[in-house]
Amino acid sequence: MNKKVYVANLPFQASEPELKVLFSRAGDVMSVKIVADRQTGQPRGIAFVEMSTQWEARRAVSMLNRTDFMGKNLLVKEAIVRRGFRGR
């Protein structure tokens, strides 16, 4: 497992600092990136959180998957690293 986790079913009003506080329960958070639509700039309801160690990433998945956050149950799982992917 790598140090990044994928977060889905994220409330659209959620902010990166709020996610950092939530994921800090599992360990040191290195970065948080909420993904936005390229054309509209609106949040897509997904994010990537990088923890400082693989162990903390595993802990975040086990602790926070299906956690209620701002009225929605989060889906938290290991992020799949796609090498060479540059997006659209």
Residue ranges and their predicted role:
Residues 1-26, 30-44, 50-88:
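Intrinsically disordered, low-complexity RNA-binding regions enriched in Gly/Arg/Ser/Tyr
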